[in-house]
Amino acid sequence: MKTAIQKAAAILCLALLSACASPAEFQNMVVTEGIDTAATQNSAFKDSIVVKSVDGGEETNPMWTSEISSQAFEKALIASLENAQLLAKLDENAPYRLRVTLLEVDQPLFGLDLTVKTRVRYEIIEKDSDKTVFSEEIPATHTATFGDSPFAIQRLRLANEGSAKNNIAAFIERVITVSPEMSGGNVALK
């Protein structure tokens, strides 16, 4: 009888622990595929960006919902920029500084398929002139299905990670096709 109660208590504890929300993990937000390396070779930003700041993320409360922290997003962004050959080799020599703000992480409260929408502002500032040469808000979404995980809390984390990864991928795709152009002290994007 005592053994059965101990087993039941252990199972209950495991069930409660598995129901706790976990934060988005940076390694699952890193863009590793789909980068147009040929376009990167011709990009004005090749090997020239350093991440200055990432703000707007939230820490996960284990008793509530999974969130994307600023630190996890920054780690994923740095690794993704490195994979895309956009990250400067030395921070102090980087001609461009990247400032990022997570403006919105829109999450559903419940559902079988959970879609998370992220909206992130990316600003690239030229180091020497302190001029903004790129400033865009980029939206992205990702849907995690019941097939990805039967647990809603885990599906939400997967949707967070996928949306953040898609957002970083959209930024990289956009920035490798843009060239900063200085003319008379004004900055224009071509």
Residue ranges and their predicted role:
Residues 1-20:
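Sec-dependent bacterial lipoprotein signal peptides
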Residues 9-12, 41-43, 90-92, 130:
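A generic structural signal for short, solvent-exposed coil/turn residues
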Residues 151-190:
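Compositionally biased, intrinsically disordered linkers/stalks adjacent to structured regions
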Residues 21-30, 84-135, 139-158:
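Surface-exposed short loop/turn segments
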Residues 70, 74, 78-81, 165-168, ...:
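Extracytoplasmic/secreted envelope proteins and their assembly/folding machinery
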Residues 20-75, 176-190:
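A structural "domain/chain start" motif
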Residues 65, 69, 73, 114-116, ...:
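Extracytoplasmic/periplasmic, Sec-exported soluble proteins
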